[in-house]
């Protein structure tokens, strides 16, 4: 959905969930915050002055490793049985991996409990890890693409790349 379609479909009763930030200025489309009276904020960063204060629910836990950990906890401990699709469980696991730098930074018991729950949901840990691996050949191709890129309007980089079947990880 593009910005216009989202704005057209929203009304005062639409539930807007803001994840991994509580700062109004970090929301990609801040105008969405004005279109609804129902906002939920899920974040693991320390509270700042630019807080989204009109939320009906704020789940902010600075001791959590990631917003993905918090979302996993919400799903895991809900009273209704939730069947989490594997791809969504893998996306949450990837979020935890990214924010913890492969479970080495800012991890706690809750982090590993969330990861264990996602594992029980059937995730393929090797597949998720491969999403973030790059070999030397891929790194060199990416370097070439970046080297040939052009900057426009001082903020946008554009590069052309001849996509080949074996290069799908670069897309």
Where are these regions (language model features)?
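Short glycine-rich anion-binding loops that position phosphate/pyrophosphate groups of nucleotides
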Residues: 5, 21-24, 45-47, 163-165
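Short alpha-helices
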Residues: 44-114
């Amino acid at each position: 959905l593009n910005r216009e379609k989202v704005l057209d479909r929203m009304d005062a009763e639409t539930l807007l969930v803001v994840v991994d930030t509580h700062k109004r200025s970090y929301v990609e489309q801040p105008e969405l915050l004005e279109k609804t009276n129902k906002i939920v904020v899920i974040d693991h960063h320390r509270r700042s002055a630019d807080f989204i204060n009109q939320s009906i629910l704020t789940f902010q836990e600075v001791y959590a490793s990631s917003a993905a950990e918090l979302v996993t906890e919400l799903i895991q401990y809900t009273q209704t049985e939730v069947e989490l699709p594997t791809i969504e469980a893998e996306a949450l696991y990837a979020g935890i991996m990214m924010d913890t730098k492969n479970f080495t930074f800012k991890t706690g018991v809750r982090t590993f409990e969330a990861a264990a729950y996602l594992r029980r949901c059937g995730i393929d840990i090797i597949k998720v890890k491969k999403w973030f691996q790059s070999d030397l050949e891929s790194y060199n191709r990416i370097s070439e693409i970046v080297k040939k890129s052009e900057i426009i309007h001082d903020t946008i980089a554009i590069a052309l790349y001849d996509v080949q079947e074996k290069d799908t990880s670069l897309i």
